[in-house]
Amino acid sequence: MFSVIVIYFKKIQIHSYQEIIDGALNYLKTKVPDVYNRTHNTTYYPLDFKKLLEYCPKLESAFDEYSIKCNMAVAYIMYNNTHSTIHIDKFHHDARINIPLLNCIGTKTIFFSGGEYEIVQNPLTKTNAKRLKSLNGIKVVTQVEIDDTTVIRVNEPHTVIMNAEQSPRITLSLGFDKDPVFLLAD
């Protein structure tokens, strides 16, 4: 019998890393302060990608060496650990690429197997996800600190634990013209 090895994450290098971080934070603070300040009761905020590109023009070419083009961005913002639960993103690709923007050192993205899930809808953004309904069979598989550009498998159960002494914790979660899951292969 074969056993399948699932790779949940992989750190990669991109061009203009710091410029993208600086531009994205500037965009969040000046153009969508309600998102930065998390005035809405949601953690997952799809961003206006064209407006974000005005602040992060290098985002268009940052992934050229991987032959993928970024075409969507989400700000994932937490002010405390109740803002993330074990969930599975309901996304048309198996992976996204996350860039740490603020206070990600000392935080963990934890991946799980098992559990029972139900589909829930974000009331603000109308996006769907699967949220843990039952701990039946749940166990930790692995974890990663998003301290650099990281491909993560969003179609597997995961959650984020932040350093409660440093908030907000913000990552930029990126989608592409083709699924970046191929970057998780050895």
Region spans (language model):
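Non-heme Fe(II)/2-oxoglutarate
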Residues: 1-68, 75
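Residues at beta-strand starts and edge strands
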Residues: 3-6, 93-95, 166-170
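Short beta-strand-to-loop capping motifs
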Residues: 11-14, 101, 174-176
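Catalytic core of non-heme Fe(II) oxygenases with the double-stranded beta-helix
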Residues: 68-149
